[in-house]
């Protein structure tokens, strides 16, 4: 194996960049997905604080996902076609969840007090849908896109675990960014 040959090291570089992009997405968008799933708990004032803590960052975090998928498409177009064909439904549902989150976040900011409850629920549903679908896709990918009941069950289990992991990251974010009763509630949600 000649490491000076571009055909040897270039795929390794692209896989490393894709891995970095997906890791950054999971960490950076994971905390705001987690905060979104924690949004149903708390009073209206606490919900404002929770949304305010992610407000400046949440939209830019999804850029890492776009970068990772873009690298997959440009570096490995055949793999991109196979993976997205196998994961068409969960990818579509994840995109629906991400779009719902964006709409809910923007409309919530302009909504009257009576309507904020609806947009909070929409933000929660979008966050839960996106995180669960990401976990399901990860589980399906790990097993090689199985069509068996056991493979589907594994994907569902990983979906639940990824959602729980994002809630953990979101609670840690709230512990760092808030104080008082909301911070104590975030600490309790860890245990």
Q: What is the predicted role of each segment?
A:
Residues 82-91, 100-162:
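Membrane-interface helix-loop-helix junctions at boundaries between adjacent transmembrane segments
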Residues 146-191:
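Loop-centered beta-sheet repeat module
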Residues 1-60, 66-69:
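N-terminal signal-anchor module of multipass membrane proteins
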Residues 13-16, 67-79, 136-144:
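Membrane-embedded alpha-helical segments in integral membrane proteins
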Residues 56-64, 123-131, 190-191:
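Select subsegments of transmembrane alpha-helices in polytopic membrane proteins
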Residues 27-30, 99-103, 163-173:
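Transmembrane alpha-helical segments that form the membrane-embedded catalytic/substrate-channel core
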Residues 33-56, 73-81, 105-116, 171-189:
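Juxtamembrane membrane-water interface segments of multi-pass membrane proteins
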Residues 12-15, 116-127, 186-191:
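Alpha-helical transmembrane segments and their helix-start/interface "positive-inside/aromatic belt" motifs
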